[in-house]
Each structure stands twice: as C-alpha cells, then as structure tokens.
Design a protein with these regions (language model features):
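An N-terminally biased module of ancient metal coordination in phosphate/nucleic-acid-related enzymes
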Residues: 1-93, 98, 102-103
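Non-cysteine beta-strand/loop elements that form the S-adenosyl-L-methionine
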Residues: 36-43, 108-118
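Active-site-proximal loop/helix segment associated with metal-binding centers of metalloenzymes
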Residues: 119-134
C-alpha cells in the first residue's frame, strides 16, 4: 500500500516515568522502520499544589529541557526524519491556563488528548482503574 504517511505522534520519554530508552534510540528505531515523522508527546506537567509529585509525568521545571532536547535532536536528524515536540494532555480546567501558557512559551508543535483522569490526578480516578461505583 502506498500513499500513507509513516508517522507516530504518540511517543513518551523517560521523563514520564513509564517509558524506557533514550530519545535517540526511539529516533533511530523509527528511521530503521521507515517512519518519516516522529512526534514526542510526554504527559503534560501539571502545576500541582501542596508538593504533590506525579508518578506519570514530568515536572513543570523539566519541560524546557524536554523541548530543548527534542529540538536539538531534530537538527541532528533533519536529513533522516522530521521531529515534533508536544504533550499528551487531559483537559483539567484548574490547570489548563497555566499549561497552555507553558506550551506557547516553549513553542511546542502540538498537543494530543489523553483523558486518563476525570479530575485532577490528585482528586479523580484513573479512567482505566476499576472502582466500586455503580
């Protein structure tokens, strides 16, 4: 079959704490498989209050380094693959304004929806977790 774009826009890094390998390893594996576009979309950091630290996402402080690292690799591999950097995000109203400002400030390429929590990670159930609700 021809005419289809070989791309992946849902790639996590070690910063989300549940992915393994380096960005470089992901890029080189994608190139070997004929992928022409690769998007990195770590879970968007949340400006949690009260010192809460997520086990599934980077901190707000890690976001600039994440974007910088992907941009630098994009320059290095420009002749082999097109790289994009963005975030996978839930829509949580209490965080959205600050997250959108960070996204704009860092010059990210895209954001994908991944609504894993119905409320904040701190206060709502994970959508894949069984509950006692009827």
């Amino acid at each position: 079959m021809t005419g289809f774009l070989k791309a992946n826009y849902h790639t996590h890094t070690y910063r989300c704490q549940h992915a393994y390998g380096s960005e470089r390893e992901y890029i080189e594996a994608a190139i070997r498989r004929g992928i022409t576009e690769l998007g990195f979309s770590d879970h968007v950091p949340c400006p949690f209050k009260d010192g809460y630290v997520s086990g599934i996402r980077m901190t707000m402080e890690q976001a600039p380094e994440y974007v910088y690292a992907i941009r630098e690799l994009g320059k290095e591999y420009a002749s082999d693959i097109k790289l994009y950097v963005g975030f996978e995000a839930e829509y949580i109203p209490e965080f959205f304004k600050e997250q959108k400002a960070m996204f704009d400030r860092l010059g990210c390429d895209y954001m994908i929806m991944g609504q894993h929590f119905m409320k904040s990670e701190q206060t709502g159930p994970y959508t894949g977790t069984p509950t006692d609700d009827e």
